[in-house]
Amino acid sequence: FLSLIPHAINAVSAIAKHF
């Protein structure tokens, strides 16, 4: 499960770049 956390953070970071 912990390995999914960096992926989630990376996804949020990528989405934030659009805004």
Swiss-Prot record:
Keywords of the record: Amidation, Amphibian defense peptide, Antibiotic, Antimicrobial, Secreted
Residues bearing the modification Phenylalanine amide: F19
Compartments, as annotated in UniProt: Secreted
Gene Ontology biological process: defense response to bacterium
GO cellular component term, pick one: extracellular region
Lineage: superkingdom: Eukaryota
Tissue expression as described in the entry: Expressed by the skin glands.
Presence of keyword Transit peptide: no
Main localisation: secreted
Entry's family note: Belongs to the frog skin active peptide (FSAP) family. Phylloseptin subfamily.
Function: Has antiparasitic activity against trypomastigote form of T.cruzi (IC(50)=0.34 uM) and against promastigote form of L.infantum (IC(50)=10.06 uM). Probably acts by permeabilizing cell membranes. In vitro, shows slight cytotoxicity against macrophages (IC(50)=34.42 uM). Has antibacterial activity.
Name of the protein: Phylloseptin-N4
Gene source species: Pithecopus nordestinus
